A protein has these predicted regions:
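C-terminal amphipathic helix plus adjacent low-complexity
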Residues: 190-192, 197-259
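Acidic donor-binding loop of glycosyltransferase active sites
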Residues: 118-135, 148
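Short acidic/histidine- and often glycine-rich active-site loop of Leloir-type glycosyltransferases
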Residues: 154-170
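Short hydrophobic beta-strand element within catalytic cores of glycosyltransferases
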Residues: 139-142, 149-153
Length: 259
């Protein structure tokens, strides 16, 4: 499974034996080539990205449009940065999404990004106000890989950092979210600190070699002890038995029907 939160949920609330579960998240290289990434001054604007058919993404777009972005834009105008824009990317934008586009408000619904990494690297801050959802969030992985600090929620960081400091900020209410977004857009030293924390998460929590070796070790153990593992899995045996029984009775029904 790619999410340690879901593993804990299955064990704690559904009593799934730990030996039936294995944690292997998205994998990342150990080191990001920071020198190849645009620095703070070379970046501009905010970015939000995600498939419009995914309900948590659509909900976050609506929250940005109707509450968060107007507040962010107003605060940036006060500090002399009224030119900041929010660019929203995602596949399958329906008419109700494209109708939200308003260049005068700095709210740009751009639809599909031909190069998601390029647009993420060009942005200064990633906004991901997810109010529900689960699993690893690809947009936040991409943001860390591109050196773009992200402002998200407790749902957003779920299964994303292993307790390490987040590479950006975590806020569940509108005012705290807006304050964090403005601060990260405005203060270069804060931005650099959070960028490095994102790199640390990739290095220490999603490192490819560590998880790959663990997966290889587990598969080898299963291969060498397959009968024992299957014998210890009572529920699995029961489900397998009844699955075979269903095909048995289906076969008998077909035979009777064809007589």
């Amino acid at each position: 499974m790619i999410s340690d939160f879901e593993i804990d949920l299955l064990q704690r609330y559904f009593s799934v034996p730990s030996q039936l579960l294995f944690y292997c998240p998205f994998l990342s290289q150990q080191k990001v080539d920071v020198a190849s990434l645009p620095d703070f001054s070379a970046r501009q604007h905010f970015i939000a990205i995600g498939n419009f058919r995914h309900e948590p993404n659509w909900d976050s777009v609506l929250w940005l449009k109707h509450q968060l972005w107007p507040m962010i834009r107003a605060q940036l105008s006060v500090v002399g940065m009224p030119q900041a824009e929010l660019h929203i990317y995602g596949a399958y934008p329906p008419p109700k999404a494209t109708q939200l586009h308003n260049a005068k408000e700095g709210f740009h619904v751009n639809g599909w990004a031909t190069d998601a990494q390029a647009v993420m690297q060009s942005a200064r801050v990633c906004l991901a106000p997810l109010r529900f959802g689960a699993g690893i969030k690809g947009k936040l992985m991409d943001a860390m890989r591109c050196g773009t600090p992200s402002i998200t929620t407790s749902i957003g960081v779920e299964s994303m950092s292993g307790g390490l400091p987040w590479g950006g900020a975590v806020a569940d209410d509108a005012e705290a979210f807006v304050t964090a977004a403005v601060a990260h857009y405005q203060v270069e030293t804060l931005w650099q600190q959070e960028q490095e924390q994102g790199f640390a998460i990739l290095r220490d929590y999603f490192y490819r070699r560590d998880h790959s070796l663990a997966l290889q070790t587990r598969l080898t153990e299963l291969l060498h002890n397959l009968q024992r593992e299957r014998g210890d899995n009572f529920i699995g045996q029961m489900l397998r038995h009844h699955s075979h029984k269903s095909t048995q009775y289906m076969g008998q029904w077909i035979e009777a029907k064809n007589k």
